[in-house]
Protein backbone atom coordinates (compact mmCIF):
# COMPACT_ATOMS: atom_id res chain seq x y z
CA UNK A 1 0.00 0.00 0.00
CA UNK A 2 1.20 3.47 -0.89
CA UNK A 3 -0.23 6.78 0.24
CA UNK A 4 -0.82 9.04 3.22
CA UNK A 5 -2.80 8.48 6.41
CA UNK A 6 -3.99 11.42 8.52
CA UNK A 7 -3.90 9.84 11.98
CA UNK A 8 -5.44 11.33 15.11
CA UNK A 9 -2.65 10.61 17.59
CA UNK A 10 -3.94 10.02 21.11
CA UNK A 11 -2.14 11.44 24.16
CA UNK A 12 0.07 8.92 25.92
CA UNK A 13 1.62 7.40 22.79
CA UNK A 14 4.87 8.43 21.14
CA UNK A 15 4.83 9.25 17.44
CA UNK A 16 7.18 6.29 16.92
CA UNK A 17 4.70 3.94 18.60
CA UNK A 18 1.87 5.24 16.42
CA UNK A 19 3.90 4.55 13.27
CA UNK A 20 4.68 1.02 14.50
CA UNK A 21 0.98 0.42 15.05
CA UNK A 22 0.23 1.72 11.55
CA UNK A 23 2.78 -0.69 10.06
CA UNK A 24 1.01 -3.61 11.71
CA UNK A 25 -2.48 -2.48 10.73
CA UNK A 26 -1.56 -1.91 7.07
CA UNK A 27 0.91 -4.77 6.85
CA UNK A 28 3.68 -2.60 5.40
CA UNK A 29 7.38 -2.40 6.17
CA UNK A 30 7.94 1.19 5.12
CA UNK A 31 6.12 3.89 7.07
CA UNK A 32 7.15 7.18 8.62
CA UNK A 33 5.65 10.37 9.99
CA UNK A 34 6.28 13.92 8.77
CA UNK A 35 6.66 15.69 12.12
CA UNK A 36 6.89 14.45 15.68
CA UNK A 37 4.21 15.08 18.29
CA UNK A 38 5.24 14.78 21.94
CA UNK A 39 3.88 11.69 23.72
CA UNK A 40 1.57 13.85 25.84
CA UNK A 41 0.22 15.76 22.85
CA UNK A 42 -2.66 14.77 20.59
CA UNK A 43 -3.82 15.60 17.10
CA UNK A 44 -2.78 15.33 13.47
CA UNK A 45 0.11 12.96 12.76
CA UNK A 46 0.72 12.54 9.03
CA UNK A 47 2.02 9.04 8.23
CA UNK A 48 3.46 8.10 4.83
CA UNK A 49 3.18 4.50 3.62
CA UNK A 50 5.34 2.61 1.14
CA UNK A 51 6.73 4.70 -1.70
CA UNK A 52 5.01 7.77 -0.21
CA UNK A 53 7.76 7.86 2.43
CA UNK A 54 9.84 9.54 -0.29
CA UNK A 55 7.52 12.53 0.03
CA UNK A 56 8.10 12.96 3.76
CA UNK A 57 10.90 15.50 3.32
CA UNK A 58 8.58 17.74 1.29
CA UNK A 59 5.86 17.58 3.93
CA UNK A 60 8.18 18.27 6.88
CA UNK A 61 8.33 21.96 6.00
CA UNK A 62 4.57 22.53 6.10
CA UNK A 63 3.08 25.12 8.46
CA UNK A 64 1.18 23.78 11.45
CA UNK A 65 -1.67 24.86 13.71
CA UNK A 66 -2.29 24.02 17.36
CA UNK A 67 -4.62 24.51 20.28
CA UNK A 68 -2.39 25.01 23.29
CA UNK A 69 -3.24 25.49 26.95
CA UNK A 70 -0.77 27.51 29.02
CA UNK A 71 -0.69 27.28 32.81
CA UNK A 72 0.85 30.34 34.43
CA UNK A 73 2.64 30.47 37.78
CA UNK A 74 4.57 27.20 37.36
CA UNK A 75 7.71 26.46 35.37
CA UNK A 76 8.79 22.85 34.84
CA UNK A 77 11.98 21.02 33.90
CA UNK A 78 10.52 19.92 30.56
CA UNK A 79 8.33 22.92 29.77
CA UNK A 80 5.19 20.79 29.93
CA UNK A 81 3.07 19.20 32.66
CA UNK A 82 5.15 16.01 32.68
CA UNK A 83 8.28 17.59 34.15
CA UNK A 84 9.21 18.50 37.70
CA UNK A 85 8.22 21.94 38.97
CA UNK A 86 11.33 24.11 38.98
CA UNK A 87 9.75 27.43 39.95
CA UNK A 88 6.38 28.35 41.39
CA UNK A 89 4.96 31.86 41.73
CA UNK A 90 1.62 33.45 42.47
CA UNK A 91 0.08 34.48 39.15
CA UNK A 92 -3.25 35.60 40.62
CA UNK A 93 -2.51 39.13 39.42
CA UNK A 94 -2.88 38.08 35.77
CA UNK A 95 -5.89 39.28 33.83
CA UNK A 96 -7.07 38.46 30.34
CA UNK A 97 -5.91 41.82 29.00
CA UNK A 98 -2.37 41.21 30.35
CA UNK A 99 -2.01 38.17 28.13
CA UNK A 100 -3.63 39.74 25.08
CA UNK A 101 -1.34 42.75 25.45
CA UNK A 102 1.88 40.71 25.01
CA UNK A 103 0.69 38.50 22.14
CA UNK A 104 2.10 40.81 19.42
CA UNK A 105 5.56 40.25 20.93
CA UNK A 106 5.22 36.54 20.13
CA UNK A 107 4.11 36.85 16.51
CA UNK A 108 6.18 37.26 13.38
CA UNK A 109 9.81 36.12 13.53
CA UNK A 110 10.61 34.89 17.02
CA UNK A 111 13.91 33.65 18.45
CA UNK A 112 13.66 30.42 20.46
CA UNK A 113 16.06 28.29 22.45
CA UNK A 114 15.27 24.62 21.71
CA UNK A 115 14.24 22.72 24.86
CA UNK A 116 16.38 19.88 26.19
CA UNK A 117 13.51 17.56 25.28
CA UNK A 118 13.96 18.21 21.54
CA UNK A 119 15.48 15.84 18.98
CA UNK A 120 18.14 18.33 17.87
CA UNK A 121 21.60 16.78 17.99
CA UNK A 122 24.48 18.08 20.11
CA UNK A 123 27.83 16.46 19.34
CA UNK A 124 26.14 13.45 17.81
CA UNK A 125 23.53 12.86 20.52
CA UNK A 126 19.94 14.03 20.61
CA UNK A 127 19.12 16.59 23.29
CA UNK A 128 16.41 14.45 24.85
CA UNK A 129 18.93 11.61 25.24
CA UNK A 130 21.23 13.96 27.14
CA UNK A 131 18.29 15.15 29.23
CA UNK A 132 17.56 11.57 30.27
CA UNK A 133 21.12 11.40 31.58
CA UNK A 134 20.47 14.51 33.63
CA UNK A 135 22.64 16.72 31.42
CA UNK A 136 21.88 20.27 30.32
CA UNK A 137 23.93 21.80 27.50
CA UNK A 138 24.00 25.24 25.94
CA UNK A 139 21.75 25.57 22.90
CA UNK A 140 21.79 28.21 20.21
CA UNK A 141 18.74 30.33 19.48
CA UNK A 142 16.79 29.59 16.33
CA UNK A 143 14.45 31.79 14.33
CA UNK A 144 10.89 30.54 13.79
CA UNK A 145 7.86 32.29 12.37
CA UNK A 146 4.59 32.65 14.27
CA UNK A 147 1.87 33.49 11.76
CA UNK A 148 -0.78 34.08 14.42
CA UNK A 149 -1.30 33.60 18.15
CA UNK A 150 -4.87 34.15 19.31
CA UNK A 151 -6.36 34.12 22.80
CA UNK A 152 -9.50 31.92 22.92
CA UNK A 153 -10.46 31.85 26.58
CA UNK A 154 -9.04 31.71 30.08
CA UNK A 155 -9.89 30.10 33.40
CA UNK A 156 -8.82 30.36 37.01
CA UNK A 157 -8.46 34.13 37.03
CA UNK A 158 -7.58 35.30 40.54
CA UNK A 159 -6.00 31.95 41.47
CA UNK A 160 -2.25 31.26 41.75
CA UNK A 161 -2.25 29.24 38.49
CA UNK A 162 -4.62 30.67 35.86
CA UNK A 163 -4.81 29.07 32.43
CA UNK A 164 -5.22 30.36 28.89
CA UNK A 165 -6.27 28.49 25.76
CA UNK A 166 -4.63 29.75 22.56
CA UNK A 167 -4.78 29.08 18.83
CA UNK A 168 -1.33 28.99 17.25
CA UNK A 169 -0.35 29.00 13.57
CA UNK A 170 3.38 28.63 13.02
CA UNK A 171 6.26 27.49 10.83
CA UNK A 172 8.04 24.17 11.08
CA UNK A 173 10.52 23.88 13.92
CA UNK A 174 8.47 25.93 16.37
CA UNK A 175 8.75 24.67 19.94
CA UNK A 176 5.38 25.34 21.54
CA UNK A 177 6.63 24.57 25.05
CA UNK A 178 9.39 27.16 24.57
CA UNK A 179 6.77 29.68 23.47
CA UNK A 180 4.79 29.00 26.66
CA UNK A 181 7.90 29.29 28.82
CA UNK A 182 8.95 32.55 27.18
CA UNK A 183 5.49 34.07 27.59
CA UNK A 184 5.51 33.17 31.28
CA UNK A 185 8.91 34.83 31.67
CA UNK A 186 7.67 37.94 29.88
CA UNK A 187 4.69 38.19 32.24
CA UNK A 188 6.91 37.69 35.28
CA UNK A 189 5.25 34.59 36.66
CA UNK A 190 6.59 31.62 34.70
CA UNK A 191 4.46 29.17 32.71
CA UNK A 192 4.37 25.75 31.12
CA UNK A 193 2.46 24.00 28.37
CA UNK A 194 -0.29 21.99 30.04
CA UNK A 195 -2.06 20.65 26.93
CA UNK A 196 -1.40 20.54 23.18
CA UNK A 197 -3.46 19.46 20.18
CA UNK A 198 -2.19 19.77 16.61
CA UNK A 199 -5.19 20.78 14.53
CA UNK A 200 -3.49 21.06 11.14
CA UNK A 201 -0.27 20.00 9.43
CA UNK A 202 -0.07 21.47 5.93
CA UNK A 203 -3.24 20.44 4.08
CA UNK A 204 -4.15 17.79 6.66
CA UNK A 205 -6.81 18.86 9.18
CA UNK A 206 -7.92 17.27 12.43
CA UNK A 207 -11.53 17.16 11.19
CA UNK A 208 -10.42 14.66 8.52
CA UNK A 209 -8.16 12.54 10.74
CA UNK A 210 -8.85 8.93 11.72
CA UNK A 211 -8.15 7.15 14.98
CA UNK A 212 -6.13 3.97 15.32
CA UNK A 213 -9.31 2.20 16.38
CA UNK A 214 -11.08 3.32 13.20
CA UNK A 215 -8.18 2.05 11.11
CA UNK A 216 -8.21 -1.29 12.89
CA UNK A 217 -11.95 -1.60 12.31
CA UNK A 218 -11.52 -0.75 8.61
CA UNK A 219 -8.83 -3.44 8.33
CA UNK A 220 -11.18 -6.00 9.87
CA UNK A 221 -13.86 -5.09 7.31
CA UNK A 222 -11.40 -5.16 4.40
CA UNK A 223 -11.92 -1.48 3.54
CA UNK A 224 -8.60 -0.08 4.77
CA UNK A 225 -7.80 1.40 1.35
CA UNK A 226 -10.60 3.94 1.87
CA UNK A 227 -8.56 5.55 4.65
CA UNK A 228 -5.54 6.18 2.42
CA UNK A 229 -5.03 9.62 0.89
CA UNK A 230 -3.50 9.68 -2.59
CA UNK A 231 0.02 11.04 -2.82
CA UNK A 232 -0.98 13.71 -5.31
CA UNK A 233 -3.31 15.33 -2.76
CA UNK A 234 -0.49 15.60 -0.24
CA UNK A 235 1.56 17.81 -2.57
CA UNK A 236 -1.32 19.58 -4.32
CA UNK A 237 0.16 22.98 -3.41
CA UNK A 238 2.92 22.43 -5.99
CA UNK A 239 2.10 23.54 -9.55
CA UNK A 240 1.08 20.61 -11.76
CA UNK A 241 2.93 19.72 -14.94
CA UNK A 242 1.10 17.04 -16.93
CA UNK A 243 3.44 14.64 -18.70
CA UNK A 244 2.72 13.07 -22.08
CA UNK A 245 2.47 9.27 -22.06
CA UNK A 246 5.49 9.08 -24.33
CA UNK A 247 7.68 10.78 -21.69
CA UNK A 248 6.57 8.82 -18.61
CA UNK A 249 9.30 6.19 -18.94
CA UNK A 250 12.02 8.85 -19.06
CA UNK A 251 10.65 10.56 -15.96
CA UNK A 252 10.56 7.19 -14.18
CA UNK A 253 14.26 6.84 -14.96
CA UNK A 254 14.96 10.24 -13.41
CA UNK A 255 15.73 11.98 -16.70
CA UNK A 256 15.06 15.66 -17.30
CA UNK A 257 11.68 16.45 -18.81
CA UNK A 258 11.73 18.97 -21.64
CA UNK A 259 8.82 20.90 -23.15
CA UNK A 260 8.14 18.39 -26.00
CA UNK A 261 7.23 15.84 -23.33
CA UNK A 262 4.81 18.18 -21.54
CA UNK A 263 1.08 18.03 -22.25
CA UNK A 264 0.13 20.98 -20.06
CA UNK A 265 1.86 23.27 -17.56
CA UNK A 266 1.39 26.63 -15.80
CA UNK A 267 2.92 29.73 -17.35
CA UNK A 268 5.89 31.64 -15.93
CA UNK A 269 7.51 28.91 -13.85
CA UNK A 270 10.70 30.27 -12.28
CA UNK A 271 13.95 28.35 -12.06
CA UNK A 272 14.21 26.49 -8.79
CA UNK A 273 10.44 26.14 -8.46
CA UNK A 274 9.25 22.72 -7.34
CA UNK A 275 6.44 21.17 -9.36
CA UNK A 276 4.59 17.87 -9.40
CA UNK A 277 4.81 15.79 -12.55
CA UNK A 278 1.65 13.79 -13.19
CA UNK A 279 0.77 11.24 -15.85
CA UNK A 280 -2.09 8.88 -16.72
CA UNK A 281 -1.49 6.85 -13.53
CA UNK A 282 -1.18 9.82 -11.19
CA UNK A 283 1.82 11.38 -9.50
CA UNK A 284 5.11 10.56 -11.20
CA UNK A 285 7.64 12.77 -9.45
CA UNK A 286 8.46 16.00 -7.69
CA UNK A 287 10.73 18.01 -9.96
CA UNK A 288 12.63 21.28 -10.00
CA UNK A 289 12.27 23.72 -12.86
CA UNK A 290 15.47 24.88 -14.54
CA UNK A 291 17.01 26.18 -17.73
CA UNK A 292 20.01 24.94 -19.66
CA UNK A 293 23.07 27.17 -19.09
CA UNK A 294 23.88 27.21 -22.81
CA UNK A 295 20.28 27.97 -23.81
CA UNK A 296 18.30 30.05 -21.30
CA UNK A 297 15.14 29.60 -23.33
CA UNK A 298 15.28 25.81 -22.91
CA UNK A 299 13.15 25.00 -19.87
CA UNK A 300 13.33 21.59 -18.22
CA UNK A 301 12.08 19.79 -15.12
CA UNK A 302 14.60 17.69 -13.20
CA UNK A 303 13.03 15.00 -10.98
CA UNK A 304 14.22 15.25 -7.38
CA UNK A 305 11.86 12.58 -6.03
CA UNK A 306 10.68 9.83 -8.39
CA UNK A 307 7.52 7.88 -7.60
CA UNK A 308 6.66 6.68 -11.10
CA UNK A 309 7.88 3.10 -10.82
CA UNK A 310 5.43 2.30 -8.08
CA UNK A 311 2.67 4.24 -9.83
CA UNK A 312 3.26 2.18 -12.95
CA UNK A 313 3.05 -1.12 -11.10
CA UNK A 314 -0.06 -0.16 -9.19
CA UNK A 315 -1.92 0.68 -12.41
CA UNK A 316 -1.58 -2.86 -13.78
UniProtKB/Swiss-Prot annotation:
Q: What positions constitute the catalytic site?
A: 38 (nucleophile)
Q: Does the keyword Mitochondrion apply?
A: no
So what does this one do?
Responsible for synthesis of pseudouridine from uracil-55 in the psi GC loop of transfer RNAs.
Where does the PUA domain start and stop, copy by copy? Answer: 238-312
What NCBIfam families does the annotation carry?
TruB (TIGR00431)
Protein name (record): tRNA pseudouridine synthase B
- InterPro entries assigned to the protein according to its UniProt record, in alphabetical order: PsdUridine_synth_cat_dom_sf, PsdUridine_synth_N, PUA-like_sf, PUA_sf, tRNA_psdUridine_synth_TruB, TruB_C
User: HAMAP family attached here?
Assistant: TruB_bact
Q: Where, if anywhere, are coiled coils annotated?
A: none
Top enzyme category: isomerase
Keywords in UniProt for this one? Isomerase, tRNA processing
Q: Give an example GO biological process.
A: mRNA pseudouridine synthesis
Single annotated GO MF: RNA binding
Which Enzyme Commission number(s) are listed? 5.4.99.25
- By its UniProt entry, which Gene3D superfamilies does this protein fall under? Pseudouridine synthase, PUA domain
Pfam families with a match to the protein in the record = TruB_C_2, TruB_N
Catalytic reaction list: uridine(55) in tRNA = pseudouridine(55) in tRNA
Amino acid sequence: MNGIVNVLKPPGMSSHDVVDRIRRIFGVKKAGHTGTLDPGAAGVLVVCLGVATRLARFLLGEDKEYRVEITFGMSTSTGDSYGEITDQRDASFLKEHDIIRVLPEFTGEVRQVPPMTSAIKWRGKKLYELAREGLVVERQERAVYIKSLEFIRGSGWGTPSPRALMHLSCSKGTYVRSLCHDMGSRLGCGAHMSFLVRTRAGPFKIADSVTLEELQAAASKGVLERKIIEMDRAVSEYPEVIVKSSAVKAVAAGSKLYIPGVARMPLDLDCGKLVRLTGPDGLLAIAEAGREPFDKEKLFFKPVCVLARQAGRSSN
